[in-house]
Amino acid sequence: MYKAVVKLIKIFMSLIFRVEVHGLENVPDDGGFILCSNHISCWDPLVIQTNVKRRIYFMAKAELFRIFFVSWILKLIKAIPVKRNGSDLNAVKSAIKTIKSGHCLGIFPTGPRAKFGDEGEVKSGIGFIACKTDAPGLPVHINATFKIFSKVTVNIGKCAQYWNGEGKPTAEDFDEISKRIYKDIKTLGKGD
């Protein structure tokens, strides 16, 4: 059912947006990794999921699971609910388990959507997850206004190891890794 729903969503999206994807060859065929993208619209996870060959287990704010149809889709794609007040240990544990099971975790380093042109604040959670799993990160940049019939450009960078695995990581390491990942995401957007 998952594949059928993704195909239907892709057809729907192709009717309202002109999606152009660069770097699909950079998406690993197997193994756990963290797909990290900028977050400008509620369309972002759908644009990424319908154009990437791997199933992505996105982290999504818990409030979305209270909206009937949205909740149904999120449960179908096995999104991980995240409580936004403070740190959500259950969500972090689920994210780590997802990656260690060989799956792709989708995460937006700034958390909630950033307004157009605003970068938002990079959260350290992605650095924490990268250190705990020793998983590579796959930077993705979306450039779009998401107006009807507009062009949506998705640039996928190369997978990179952001944690060297040496020593015990600190809170500063988590912040540094998160910022490096976000810098790579922004760099992908400079060509648009």
Regions found by a protein language model. Name each.
Residues 25-28, 96-97:
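Short amphipathic alpha-helix with an adjacent loop that forms part of the alpha/beta core around
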Residues 14, 27-86:
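Catalytic core of membrane glycerolipid acyltransferases/transacylases, capturing the structured
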Residues 90-192:
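Non-catalytic C-terminal accessory region of glycerolipid acyltransferases
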Residues 5, 65-70, 147-149:
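Short, glycine/polar-rich helix-capping loops at beta-to-alpha or helix-loop-helix junctions
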Residues 14-22:
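Short gly/ser/thr-rich secondary-structure transition/capping motifs
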Residues 3-12:
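N-terminal nucleotide/polyanion-binding subdomain common to many enzyme families
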Residues 21-24, 67, 89-92:
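Structural motif corresponding to alpha-helix initiation and N-cap regions
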